[in-house]
């Protein structure tokens, strides 16, 4: 029982202990439950707090999206207001038709835009390589891409800006852009750390990273800074020459990749525009598809780096495992823009041979077998197969096997010009970026998956060494150490020597500032910052019409100049071209620009102020004073490009290269053309006989001429109030050109002057002007006619006339060019006393100290002279009243004119020696000693001369006379001749006035008048048209053909000795 009681007590004690332990456990459980509840509450509170923060962030995101959309709408409105932006460079054009996929949101485009533009690097010698940094998205002028701007200084007084000329142009464009809106989106052109700059408060400026976007507000301040804001909200000052404005969403950037299929020579991402927009690049050569941009070698390819015409390519190819007989490679899918197209599969290639094709969606890995990596090297490539073609295999490639190194292989330089070249290579791994060195100086970095590079702004005829250094994205541990260390490859090349510059573009012709000129405009060719085009130093531009330079401007950047209409009309030019002038020569002609027809029509002449003329008895006798209807001007008065022979008579064609362009051919002025085809022996024999006969005739004429001059020099002059009179038989003289006449009369030689008591002066209006002597000049357009008697001079002063002795036809043809060259020289030695009106002295313009009158016409005064109609004069010299006239009112009262210009004159000259004349629809005064009269007795002849506008001074007088005689009813022998060859003067004639010659075909029968002239030409008629025909193209009609020939020798009727003739008048200013 005792044991049972002890047992029971023990059990109760254990029970109590168990209850106590249980209570303790229960309390512990309660504490744990309470802690759990508290932890749950705390968790719920934290979750609620996080949820509220998330809601706040979402709200901020929504607000920012709305702000961004608002800015996008503002940009769109701005684009609509300003219109499409014309980004025309000054030369070659790169057309980018690579728009983004339709429907792609602009914010999505902006998210990746920052990766597509990067900083450029300056070349070793001031030359800059790629045009990718050269994307001016605003303004009209483009400048060199790679010149890094100098810092802008902000100071209280004075404010200084040190910018290059290029950046000044850009900033001026930027200021125009910034003034048209409140907020503008910009992209940083260069990286900028304010603390490295020269300004005292760098904390007020924003740090910039090349290619990143930012906003600017308002206008640029006077120091050249904008107030800007980065995309992260940071605000501050932004230097204007470190940013580029983004015009609108048309200027979207998209990557364009180098591919052999589309000949894309560029090595970086490019700009993509919508399909209706074109980007014009300012570069010496045309680039096909994009603008290069310098990247840093990242492996991440943004969707926006894929252009519309670029096939997306696989990315990040990796060598997973390399075995003795096989390799395993992997890659990532391509970045395909929405709506671009579909990618159906991948092709895996080994040395350009397709080994397998994997469907899209399967694992992007491939096991390539049947390789011998221990003994051979293989190029593994992966390309995408899409609905728009396959991607470029070199954009996803790597080398495996034996002797693989990091350095690229097969460096090549192609498309070498004077200032550009294209570099290409094969990368060891498409994930590698590459650093380009030019002449041992780092030039640029080419991003991954690019293997081509374009050099620009190189120097002509210079040797370059290019080094390409590969930069692996990660260390290729699978390669041995010595193969890993081989990272660079080199190539050398030389640019071409400087060649002729490029011609201007877009040549146009429109009305000029005055009625007497037209404005020719063009777009200059692309010039480097140093003013080179194709390596040639551009100096200016020349305007050409029918191969002759009619205007010139010396300015490399000129885009237009004025051209005198008189020159164009005298050449009968319908179009003009422009050439670029340089030290190395002229460029090719630009595209022809048509001259508007309304500008070429001469203005209608003013109504005549003189009363109708009275009929004169001698009117019918002055027909011989007319210019022939076939004598026209086909070249400029200023220069003639037709060369001529050095001797007087020749039937064989002269050497066409004996005289350079721009020279007037010595007399005779007409050159016999060369017939094309087999010569006819009889024709040659007859031509030689005619030439011999001409020499004999010429010798006789010279003897008679010499005899006449001796007789005339021995004659006595009339004194008192009578004009000079001559008595001599008629002498048939050889044809002398108008230029020879002028040379023999006023300019040809130093005259024999009478000084002292032998010379008496006459005054005009009491002025002390050097006397204007007035005599009748023997008319050289007709046979020399000596007449007795004369008329009384209006002045009572008597004087002795001065004459030049010698044969004007023989007076130094060799020095004729010298005469032409010095005709425009100005001595500047004479002093003038300004009077109300003065006639300029000839000696001012010819560089001679003394000049006397030479030949004067002998004519009679008609009582009705004041009622004569308007007369036609030809200018003997160039005359510009502004620079050559001593009169103070010259600019308003006197008319300018050019040598050889036809001038319409009303009435007689006044007491001061001035005519009242009209040129270019303008009335004014004409100095009488600068012009010479040409008589035209009928309206048709006068109208023809006025329409012609110019009379070439090398027009042979005998041919003018012959043309005149052809219209008179004199008895002239005629013959019929057959043409042996086809002849078109405009194509075959070496002469200037091709309109004076007749075209004909083989077998045509031509009626010729008179004998052959000293130049080897007949005057003939064909199909009602009259003109000159070359004798060596003709043969007389055989005897068995019926022809009517005159047996009488050719002759011309002469006027009776005492017949009154209307003479040319000319006043010469004489300085004793």
From Swiss-Prot:
InterPro entries: FN3_dom, FN3_sf, Ig-like_fold, RIM-BP_SH3_2, RIM-BP_SH3_3, RIMBP1/2/3, SH3-like_dom_sf, SH3_domain. GO terms for cellular component: calyx of Held; glutamatergic synapse; plasma membrane; presynaptic active zone cytoplasmic component. Residues 771-781 have a biased composition (Acidic residues). One of its GO terms (biological process) is regulation of calcium-dependent activation of synaptic vesicle fusion. Keywords: Cell membrane, Membrane, Phosphoprotein, Repeat, SH3 domain, Synapse. Residues 599-615 have a biased composition (Pro residues). Residues 660-670 have a biased composition (Low complexity). Its main location: membrane. SMART domains: FN3, SH3. Residues 620-635, 730-743, 754-765 have a biased composition (Basic and acidic residues). Residues 181-248, 868-936, 972-1039 form the SH3 domain. Interacts with RIMS1, RIMS2, CACNA1D and CACNA1B, and potentially with other Ca(2+) channel alpha-1 isoforms. This is RIMS-binding protein 2. It comes from Mus musculus (Mouse).
């Amino acid at each position: 029982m005792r044991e049972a009681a002890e047992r029971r007590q023990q059990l109760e004690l254990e029970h109590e202990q168990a209850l106590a332990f249980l209570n303790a456990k229960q309390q512990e459980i309660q504490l744990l439950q309470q802690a759990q509840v508290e932890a749950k509450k705390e968790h719920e509170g934290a979750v609620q707090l996080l949820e509220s923060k998330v809601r706040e962030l979402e709200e901020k995101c929504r607000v920012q999206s709305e702000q961004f959309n608002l800015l996008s709408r503002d940009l769109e409105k701005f684009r609509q207001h300003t219109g499409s932006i014309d980004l025309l460079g000054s030369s070659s054009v790169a057309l980018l038709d690579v728009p983004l996929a339709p429907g792609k949101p602009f914010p999505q485009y902006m998210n990746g835009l920052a990766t597509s533009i990067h900083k450029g690097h300056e070349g070793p010698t001031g030359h800059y390589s790629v045009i990718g940094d050269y994307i001016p998205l605003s303004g009209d002028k483009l400048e060199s891409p790679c010149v890094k701007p100098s810092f802008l200084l902000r100071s209280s007084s004075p404010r200084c800006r040190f910018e290059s000329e290029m950046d000044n142009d850009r900033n001026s464009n930027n200021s125009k852009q910034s003034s048209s809106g409140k907020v503008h989106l910009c992209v940083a052109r260069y990286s900028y750390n304010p603390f490295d700059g020269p300004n005292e408060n760098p904390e007020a400026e924003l740090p910039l990273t090349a290619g990143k976007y930012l906003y600017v507000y308002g206008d640029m301040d006077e120091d050249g800074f904008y107030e800007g804001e980065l995309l992260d909200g940071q605000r501050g000052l932004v230097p204007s020459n470190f940013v580029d404005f983004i015009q609108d969403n048309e200027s979207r950037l998209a990557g364009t990749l180098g591919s052999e299929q589309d000949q894309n020579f560029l090595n970086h991402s490019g700009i993509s525009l919508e399909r209706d927009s074109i980007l014009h690049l300012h570069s010496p050569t045309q680039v096909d598809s994009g603008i290069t941009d310098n990247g840093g070698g990242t492996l991440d390819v943004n969707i926006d780096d894929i252009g519309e015409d670029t096939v997306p390519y696989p990315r990040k190819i990796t060598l997973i495992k390399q075995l003795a007989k096989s390799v395993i490679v992997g890659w990532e899918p391509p970045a395909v823009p929405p709506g671009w197209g579909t990618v159906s599969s991948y092709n895996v290639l080994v040395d350009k041979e397709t080994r397998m094709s994997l469907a899209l969606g399967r694992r992007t890995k491939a096991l390539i077998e049947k390789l011998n990596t221990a003994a051979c090297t293989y190029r593994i490539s992966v390309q995408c197969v899409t609905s728009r073609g396959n991607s470029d295999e070199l954009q996803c490639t790597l080398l495996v096997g034996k002797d693989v190194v990091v350095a690229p292989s097969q460096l090549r330089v192609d498309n070498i010009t004077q200032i550009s070249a294209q570099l290409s290579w094969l990368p060891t791994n498409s994930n590698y970026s590459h650093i380009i060195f030019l002449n041992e100086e780092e030039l640029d970095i080419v991003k991954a998956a690019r293997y081509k590079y374009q050099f620009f702004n190189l120097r002509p005829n210079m040797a370059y060494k290019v080094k390409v250094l590969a930069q692996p994205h990660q260390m290729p541990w699978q390669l041995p150490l010595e193969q890993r260390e081989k990272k660079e490859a080199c190539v050398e090349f030389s640019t071409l020597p400087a060649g002729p510059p490029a011609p201007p573009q877009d040549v146009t012709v429109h009305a000029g500032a005055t009625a007497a000129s037209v404005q020719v405009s063009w777009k200059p060719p692309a010039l480097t910052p140093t003013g080179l085009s194709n390596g040639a130093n551009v100096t200016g531009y020349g305007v050409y019409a029918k191969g002759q330079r009619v205007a010139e401007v010396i300015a490399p950047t000129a885009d237009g100049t004025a051209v005198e209409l008189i020159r164009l009309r005298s050449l009968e030019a319908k179009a003009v071209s422009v050439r670029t002038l340089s030290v190395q020569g002229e460029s090719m002609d630009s595209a022809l620009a048509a001259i508007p027809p309304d500008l070429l029509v001469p203005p209608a002449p003013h109504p005549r102020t003189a009363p109708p003329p009275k009929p004169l008895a001698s009117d019918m006798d002055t027909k011989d004073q007319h210019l022939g209807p076939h004598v026209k001007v086909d070249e400029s008065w200023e220069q003639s490009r037709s060369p001529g022979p050095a001797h007087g008579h020749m039937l064989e064609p002269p050497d066409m290269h004996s005289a350079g362009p721009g020279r007037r051919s010595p007399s005779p002025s007409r050159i016999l053309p060369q017939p094309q085809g087999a010569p006819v022996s009889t024709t040659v024999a007859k031509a030689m006989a005619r030439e011999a006969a001409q020499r004999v005739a010429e010798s006789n004429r010279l003897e008679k001429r010499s005899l006449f001059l001796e007789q005339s020099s021995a004659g006595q002059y009339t004194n008192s109030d009578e004009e000079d009179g001559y008595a001599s038989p008629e002498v048939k003289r050889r044809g002398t050109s108008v230029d020879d006449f002028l040379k023999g009369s006023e300019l040809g030689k130093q005259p024999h002057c009478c000084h002292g008591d032998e010379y008496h002066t006459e005054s005009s209006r009491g002025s002390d002007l050097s006397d204007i002597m007035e005599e009748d000049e023997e008319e050289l357009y007709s046979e020399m006619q000596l007449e007795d008697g004369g008329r009384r001079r209006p002045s009572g002063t008597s004087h002795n006339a001065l004459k030049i002795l010698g044969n004007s036809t023989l007076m130094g043809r060799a020095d004729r060019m010298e005469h032409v060259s010095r005709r425009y020289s100005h001595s500047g030695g004479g002093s003038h006393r300004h009077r109300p009106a003065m006639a300029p002295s000839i000696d001012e313009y010819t560089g001679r100290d003394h000049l006397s009158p030479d030949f004067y016409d002998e004519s009679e005064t008609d009582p009705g002279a004041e009622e004569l109609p308007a007369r036609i004069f030809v200018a003997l010299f160039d005359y510009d009243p502004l620079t050559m006239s001593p009169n103070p009112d010259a600019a308003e009262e006197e008319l300018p004119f050019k040598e050889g210009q036809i001038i319409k004159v009303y009435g007689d000259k006044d007491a001061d020696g001035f005519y009242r004349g009209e040129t270019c629809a303008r009335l004014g005064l004409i100095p009488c000693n600068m012009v010479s009269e040409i008589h035209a007795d009928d309206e048709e002849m006068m109208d023809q001369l006025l329409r012609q506008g110019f009379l070439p001074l090398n027009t042979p007088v005998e041919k003018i006379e012959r043309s005149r005689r052809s219209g008179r009813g004199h008895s002239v022998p005629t013959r019929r001749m057959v043409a042996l060859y086809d002849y078109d003067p405009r194509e075959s004639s070496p002469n200037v006035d091709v309109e004076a010659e007749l075209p004909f075909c083989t077998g045509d029968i031509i009626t010729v008048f008179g004998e052959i002239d000293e130049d080897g030409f007949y005057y003939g008629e064909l199909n009602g048209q009259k003109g000159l025909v070359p004798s060596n193209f003709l043969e007389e009609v055989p005897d068995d053909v019926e022809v009517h020939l005159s047996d009488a020798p050719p002759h011309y009727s002469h006027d009776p000795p005492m017949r009154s003739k209307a003479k040319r008048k000319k006043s010469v200013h004489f300085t004793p």
